Amino acid sequence: MKKIECACNFLMDKDAQGYIDLSDLDLTSCHFKGDVISKVSFLSSNLQHVTFECKEIGDCNFTTAIVDNVIFRCRRLHNVIFIKASGECVDFSKNILDTVDFSQSQLGHSNFRECQIRNSNFDNCYLYASHFTRAEFLSAKEISFIKSNLTAVMFDYVRMSTGNFKDCITEQLELTIDYSDIFWNEDLDGYINNIIKMIDTLPDNAMILKSVLAVKLVMQLKILNIVNKNFIENMKKIFSHCPYIKDPIIRSYIHSDEDNKFDDFMRQHRFSEVNFDTQQMIDFINRFNTNKWLIDKNNNFFIQLIDQALRSTDDMIKANVWHLYKEWIRSDDVSPIFIETEDNLRTFNTNELTRNDNIFILFSSVDDGPVMVVSSQRLHDMLNPTKDTNWNSTYIYKSRHEMLPVNLTQETLFSSKSHGKYALFPIFTASWRAHRIMNKGV
């Protein structure tokens, strides 16, 4: 209590500029309580565990102050300076921070939850593991975090349309934006363009975060059916140099004409022979990756794409199409539905067939090529490089009446050299539920 009384006595002393001078003092655990705290200098003071309980703090200076565990139970901080202030676990939660300069401060593990932040500066700050959950950055002026350490900082569902994150440290940074300001926004173009610019200011080592933010923005615009040439052109310009421009969700929004071309091309060639060029392979693989339901509607098209892409000389195309194929094959968890009836004969285990089982009919892409009936579990095993699976004497059908045994390995299945023009690869699978097989046969 003595320290509190002592601190209050200092409030009576003002300097020539009308400021109350509380500089270079040990004010540990003081409790400042009142209506308005105005024109007070806490320059280089020790404010550890201090509580400010008032309606407003205005025109105050906390430069180089020690502020560990300081609590600001205020409605508003206006025109306040925290330059080079240092301390952890400072609580600004639910305050209005209006024209507050935090530049060069060290405020790790601090709490900015649900703050309304206007015209404030966070340049060169150390904000390790601080929380801005549901904070609102409301100023028309850009909120700046240039060169700040934002490691493990949580910007969770923040309302934010302007910001500069240039040269920040962003390891483990989490940033999600509340897009509620899209609704009834009189300057929607400006709002969207500012967000696009803000995303672009994030450093290149935060590419995954930039990608997520860009995709979520585009998804929000697509859900609301907001299409505007102005900010679409801005996206093309700003995002064009970044890898996430290739994300199918973004491309389908800013290059919607490409989707139409894809759909038209696929419809036209659904039942005909197609020779894909390199760019078509890339585009169509991306399209199927994001819209796997298209596969069942475009089986012939998909067969040929898989075939030609796996034979491509482009390693990236081969890797992407192999990933697409494996993901698609593994999309259903299915039990084995074959039993051994003789040494080299497998047949359907009808006792094991359920409505949830899939039987895959596997085709070669060449004319009159072999066809195989197999359970998806066999394919799962085949595609598992860590599992030593014996594929001897699986029955391959060149027709319903002619059976040819073959040793089915990854080499015989996917290497065009092993069977010449009758190579078994690619597996193209059309899956039928087991009850269809039982009803219709194979």
Curated annotation (Swiss-Prot):
Coiled coil: none
Signal peptide as annotated in the record: none
Disulfide bond annotation, renumbered to this chain: none
Gene3D superfamilies: E3 ubiquitin-protein ligase SopA, HECT-like ubiquitin ligase, Putative secreted effector protein
Domain of life, per lineage: Bacteria
InterPro entries hit by this protein: 5peptide_repeat, Pentapeptide-BTB/POZ_domain, SopA-like_central
Pfam family for this entry, one: SopA
Other notes: The sdgG mutation, which suppresses a conditional mutation in dnaG (DNA primase), has been localized to one of the ubiA, ubiC or yjbI genes.
Designated name of the protein: Putative protein YjbI
Organism: Escherichia coli (strain K12)
